Amino acid sequence: MIQSQINRNIRLDLADAILLSKAKKDLSFAEIADGTGLAEAFVTAALLGQQALPADAARQVGAKLDLDEDAILLLQMIPLRGCIDDRIPTDPTMYRFYEMLQVYGTTLKALVHEKFGDGIISAINFKLDVKKVADPEGGERAVITLDGKYLPTKPF
C-alpha cells in the first residue's frame, strides 16, 4: 500500500545516513542509480528526501548502500516535498540558483507565457539533467536541463 510522510525530519535523517554510506563506499549518485531504470537526478532527489522510489529501485539502492529494511521502506514513501528551510539559501551553490531566479525568473515567466499561454511548467511531470561540458574559452560549463510538461490554466 502507498504510504505518505508528514514529517520532513525522518527523510532528512535518512538522507544524512545515505550520504554517509555513499561516502564510505565511495559511490557516485550515477553508480547508485545504475540499474534502477531511473534517471540519476530522480534517484538523487529520492536519496535526498524529495521523491519516492518504486519498490524494486529502493531495494537495489538499499543493497548498494547497505540500508536496512526500514530505510528501504522509507525510500518508497511519498515524502513531504519542497521542505528546504523557508529562507534565502546560504549554501553558495543553492544560492546561485536562487540568484538565477531572482535575475531571470520574470524573463522565464514572460517567455513561457508568450510561447505557451497562461499556465505553469510541471515539477511533477518533470525531468532534470546536469551535464559537464568543456568551455571553449577554457574551463568547464554546467548545462542544466529542466524539462517539465506545460499545464495550461483552465478557466472554470
UniProtKB/Swiss-Prot annotation:
Keyword Lyase in record: yes
Keywords: Lyase
InterPro entries xrefs: Cyanase (IPR008076), Cyanate_lyase_C (IPR003712), Cyanate_lyase_C_sf (IPR036581), CYNS_N (IPR048564), Lambda_DNA-bd_dom_sf (IPR010982)
Biological-process GO terms, alphabetical: cyanate metabolic process
Pfam families: Cyanate_lyase (PF02560), CYNS_N (PF21291)
Quaternary structure note: Homodecamer composed of five homodimers.
Protein name, UniProt field: Cyanate hydratase
Gene: cynS
